[in-house]
């Protein structure tokens, strides 16, 4: 079932990207904004990359002194649906629920987390949240919706990176993975003046090759142990309803702990997220609070 869900979500990803939209984790969508509203492309980034504007869906690879790809293990690349072909020793979370000792997968308090913004739908969620929470944002959405990104910050929420354009990382080359991460970091730096500390892989697709690259950026991998599958509300999947999601939330409340995966890239998922927030209440934590660590690697004035 996990493999089928991943295949389905990637197929929807391809459709929405062709329509000029940016797909959210596991299927929900976040529309890209108008170019004239973008975060200005900073001079320091032009000097470093010799480019003058933000990239499209496929960002170019820019070598970095502190990223040594010779230290990355040589593991097979794989695509959605190919889990039976890869070794369990690759420690794939999306295939085998395999986690590394450094991965964050849960929290001692039941807490919501949100992927794929910033997006217009995010604004409604920000107005209703009663506590600090964690947003994992796409770089391409960050530069296209800088005002919404700033609203997230103004309300004191924690922001982590979710790559530049939501690619299935295990299918990419090492250089392409670096590009997805570095451009997302630069987008956050230019828009929010900080260097993120937390990283969530799109689709939860991560193995030890991807981890090795992520760790060289100094990022902490954040996964989840409670999945709402709210993206199925966007795809009109008959196997998931709002009522079923809220029933799961009530069950999870009894456990009083865990990290919930949700999405803020679409109006429908935000509507459910607000109801979930009302059910759980404000006694929730950010990822940094869950593990007793700092919000960002660095902040800039």
Curated annotation (Swiss-Prot):
<dbReference type="GO" id="GO:0006032">
    <property type="term" value="P:chitin catabolic process"/>
</dbReference>
<protein>
    <recommendedName>
        <fullName>Chitin deacetylase 1</fullName>
        <ecNumber>3.5.1.41</ecNumber>
    </recommendedName>
</protein>
<feature type="binding site">
    <location>
        <position position="162"/>
    </location>
    <ligand>
        <name>Co(2+)</name>
    </ligand>
</feature>
<keyword id="KW-0624">Polysaccharide degradation</keyword>
<keyword id="KW-0170">Cobalt</keyword>
<keyword id="KW-0732">Signal</keyword>
<dbReference type="Pfam" id="PF01522">
    <property type="entry name" value="Polysacc_deac_1"/>
</dbReference>
<dbReference type="GO" id="GO:0046872">
    <property type="term" value="F:metal ion binding"/>
</dbReference>
<dbReference type="InterPro" id="IPR050248">
    <property type="entry name" value="Polysacc_deacetylase_ArnD"/>
</dbReference>
<comment type="similarity">
    <text>Belongs to the polysaccharide deacetylase family.</text>
</comment>
<dbReference type="InterPro" id="IPR011330">
    <property type="entry name" value="Glyco_hydro/deAcase_b/a-brl"/>
</dbReference>
<keyword id="KW-0479">Metal-binding</keyword>
<feature type="domain" description="NodB homology">
    <location>
        <begin position="108"/>
        <end position="288"/>
    </location>
</feature>
<keyword id="KW-0378">Hydrolase</keyword>
<feature type="signal peptide">
    <location>
        <begin position="1"/>
        <end position="24"/>
    </location>
</feature>
<feature type="binding site">
    <location>
        <position position="166"/>
    </location>
    <ligand>
        <name>Co(2+)</name>
    </ligand>
</feature>
<dbReference type="GO" id="GO:0008061">
    <property type="term" value="F:chitin binding"/>
</dbReference>
<dbReference type="GO" id="GO:0004099">
    <property type="term" value="F:chitin deacetylase activity"/>
</dbReference>
<feature type="glycosylation site" description="N-linked (GlcNAc...) asparagine">
    <location>
        <position position="68"/>
    </location>
</feature>
<dbReference type="GO" id="GO:0000272">
    <property type="term" value="P:polysaccharide catabolic process"/>
</dbReference>
<dbReference type="GO" id="GO:0005628">
    <property type="term" value="C:prospore membrane"/>
</dbReference>
<feature type="active site" description="Proton donor">
    <location>
        <position position="263"/>
    </location>
</feature>
<feature type="binding site">
    <location>
        <position position="203"/>
    </location>
    <ligand>
        <name>acetate</name>
    </ligand>
</feature>
<comment type="function">
    <text>Hydrolyzes the N-acetamido groups of N-acetyl-D-glucosamine residues in chitin to form chitosan and acetate. Chitosan is a component of the spore wall.</text>
</comment>
<keyword id="KW-0146">Chitin degradation</keyword>
<feature type="glycosylation site" description="N-linked (GlcNAc...) asparagine">
    <location>
        <position position="50"/>
    </location>
</feature>
<feature type="disulfide bond">
    <location>
        <begin position="107"/>
        <end position="290"/>
    </location>
</feature>
<keyword id="KW-0119">Carbohydrate metabolism</keyword>
<keyword id="KW-0961">Cell wall biogenesis/degradation</keyword>
<feature type="binding site">
    <location>
        <position position="116"/>
    </location>
    <ligand>
        <name>Co(2+)</name>
    </ligand>
</feature>
<keyword id="KW-0325">Glycoprotein</keyword>
<dbReference type="InterPro" id="IPR002509">
    <property type="entry name" value="NODB_dom"/>
</dbReference>
<keyword id="KW-0749">Sporulation</keyword>
<keyword id="KW-0147">Chitin-binding</keyword>
<feature type="binding site">
    <location>
        <position position="115"/>
    </location>
    <ligand>
        <name>acetate</name>
    </ligand>
</feature>
<feature type="glycosylation site" description="N-linked (GlcNAc...) asparagine">
    <location>
        <position position="189"/>
    </location>
</feature>
<feature type="glycosylation site" description="N-linked (GlcNAc...) asparagine">
    <location>
        <position position="26"/>
    </location>
</feature>
<feature type="active site" description="Proton acceptor">
    <location>
        <position position="115"/>
    </location>
</feature>
<keyword id="KW-1015">Disulfide bond</keyword>
<dbReference type="GO" id="GO:0030476">
    <property type="term" value="P:ascospore wall assembly"/>
</dbReference>
